[in-house]
A protein has these predicted regions:
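Active-site neighborhood of phospho(di)ester-bond hydrolases with catalytic His/Asp-centered motifs
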Residues: 57-58, 86-90, 118-124, 152-153, ...
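Active-site-proximal beta-strand elements of phosphoester/diester hydrolases
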Residues: 51-61, 161-170, 191-195, 252-258
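Conserved beta-sheet core of the metallophosphoesterase superfamily
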Residues: 197-274
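N-terminal secretory signal peptides and thylakoid transit peptides that target proteins
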Residues: 1-18
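Membrane-embedded segments
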Residues: 52-139
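Extended active-site neighborhood of metal-dependent phosphoesterases/phosphodiesterases
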Residues: 36-39, 103-184
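Beta-strand-turn-beta hairpins that frame and shape the catalytic cleft
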Residues: 42-54, 149, 156-165, 185-186, ...
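C-terminal segment of N-terminal export signals and the immediately downstream linker at the start
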Residues: 1, 18-55, 68-69, 73-76
């Protein structure tokens, strides 16, 4: 039988353990940036893009919740990678008011750019607090564009023979995959930027597109046990957690765990930026 002293000792250890885990989850892991390195397969990739690097950054959530010095460190890390291309897949800000536009302008001055090109899309938080404020989205998009980054809102551009398309945000009800991919033809090398991976499940709207997609939005669930799926995911399709997923119709998606947060807690889901090396599929 456990005596009082042993019981109190065990209880004290338990409390200390819980406090340590809480401190780790709140103060350490949300800012413990991971640089993930992967290969990105593109069918019929133009020769000029073989071996080029692409930095994927998502879910910055610039605003009152994410520490400014942490974001500065993210920018510095991204610039040191010297990517050829950079893709930002939305949720630039956590909107609370016009102060976020000034913060965004400051951070855009330091955000990494690709030596060849830099592209971006919008996420739901870029549409304001209720994801329906069109003027907020226009202001965010304008600031990004004025900084020299090519904003893609249901449109595409040609990159040396490869189509790069960007789909607008799903929750704001402005996602139009068919419009974004209007210039795509079967067999054309392409890459799609799309904030919310749930958008992938409207297959008919994608017009037969069978290439690679970069997404964010989920933050990887932010908390998960080593062997179980995250208990909370902001998507309908719970397959869409993080990392590379085979959609099943030729499309593959990489879902970033994101940089920022709306709730300062992460467990077993470190924030990330991802450095891809392009190669032929």
């Amino acid at each position: 039988m456990m005596n009082r002293r042993a019981f109190l000792g065990a209880a004290g250890c338990g409390v200390a353990g819980v406090a340590a885990l809480a401190g780790y989850a709140h103060l350490l892991e949300p800012f413990w940036l991971d640089v993930t390195r992967r290969r990105l397969p593109i069918r019929r990739l133009p020769q000029s893009l073989h071996g080029r690097t692409l930095l994927h950054v998502s879910d910055l959530h610039i605003g009152p919740l994410v520490d400014e010095s942490y974001l500065d460190r993210v920018w510095r890390t991204g610039r040191e990678l010297q990517p050829d291309l950079v893709a930002y897949t939305g949720d630039w800000v956590t909107w609370r008011g016009t102060a976020q536009l000034r913060q965004l302008e400051t951070h855009l001055a330091n955000a990494p750019r690709g030596r060849i090109a830099t592209y971006a899309t919008l996420g739901n938080h870029d549409y304001g607090e209720r994801w329906r404020e069109l003027q907020v989205a226009a202001n965010v998009a304008d600031r990004v564009t004025q900084s020299g980054i090519r904003m893609l809102r249901n449109e595409s551009v040609d990159l040396d023979g490869m189509l790069v398309a960007g789909i607008d945000d799903l929750w704001s009800r402005h996602a139009q995959p068919r419009k974004a991919l209007a210039a795509w033809r079967a067999g054309t090398p392409a890459l799609v930027l799309n904030h919310n991976p749930d958008c992938l499940d409207d297959r008919a709207a994608w017009g037969g597109y069978d290439g690679y997609v970069l997404s964010g939005h989920t933050h990887g669930g932010q908390c998960r046990s080593p062997f179980l799926a995250p208990p909370i995911l902001p998507v309908l399709n719970k397959r869409y957690t993080s990392g590379e997923i085979d959609v099943g119709d030729g499309r593959r998606v990489y879902i970033s765990r994101g940089v920022g947060f709306n709730l300062q807690v992460r467990v077993n889901v470190r924030p990330e930026i991802t450095l891809f090396t392009l190669h032929p599929a």
